[in-house]
């Protein structure tokens, strides 16, 4: 799923799940590419009333109005779509590259993310790590890991040692130490998972 500023859960679902409609997917990708080219810039941008303190590297990032960046380690090649009504907070020790963060998001406390889309009012904190993943509105992620997941609205994974791989979720509550995987070790990746809306995984559960 290509990420861009206006990506919605509905559009991402169509692109991810309707690959048997190649003409539709090709046209959607063309529209996304056209929008992306219109937004493309050789320079980063810092909007009005932005607060940046004790921060390491910021390179090729578009920062929206009223964003707060405090103690962040590294931000590279991304967009932070903050605004006055819903400012974005990027806190201590965050490392992010190839990302888009939507309005009202809160990312702090050592989060590491790469090639991710973070939706409106999402909270990622407490050493959570993610790559190649989509998080849509009001997701909350702490402590665990995510790899190539489609986290629909209100997906929650707050416990330590939780691992979500190659799955699609919404209104999920992942238990402590739960593992949703797409491979059996030596066999390598074999499929992707779809967990029904509103599911709850128990502690130390394993779903293949």
Which residues are covered by each model-predicted region?
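Structural signal for interior beta-strand "rungs" in well-ordered beta-sheet cores
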Residues: 37-208
């Amino acid at each position: 799923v290509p990420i861009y500023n206006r990506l919605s859960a509905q559009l991402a679902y169509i692109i991810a799940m309707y690959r048997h409609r190649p003409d539709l997917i090709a046209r959607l990708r063309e529209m996304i590419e056209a929008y992306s080219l219109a937004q493309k810039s050789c320079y980063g941008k810092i909007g009005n009333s932005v607060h940046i303190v004790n921060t390491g590297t910021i390179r090729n990032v578009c920062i929206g109005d009223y964003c707060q960046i405090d103690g962040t380690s590294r931000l590279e090649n991304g967009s932070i779509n903050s605004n006055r009504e819903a400012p974005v907070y990027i806190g201590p020790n965050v490392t992010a590259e190839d990302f888009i963060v939507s309005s009202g998001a809160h990312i702090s406390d050592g989060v590491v993310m790469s090639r991710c889309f973070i939706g409106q009012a999402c909270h990622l904190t407490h050493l959570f790590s993610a790559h190649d993943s989509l998080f849509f509105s009001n997701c909350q992620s702490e402590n665990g890991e995510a790899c190539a997941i489609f986290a629909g609205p209100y997906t929650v994974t707050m416990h330590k040692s939780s691992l979500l791989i190659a799955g699609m979720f919404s209104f999920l509550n992942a238990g402590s130490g739960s593992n949703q995987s797409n491979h059996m070790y030596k066999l390598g990746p074999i499929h992707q998972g779809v967990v029904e809306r509103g599911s709850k995984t128990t502690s130390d559960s394993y779903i293949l």
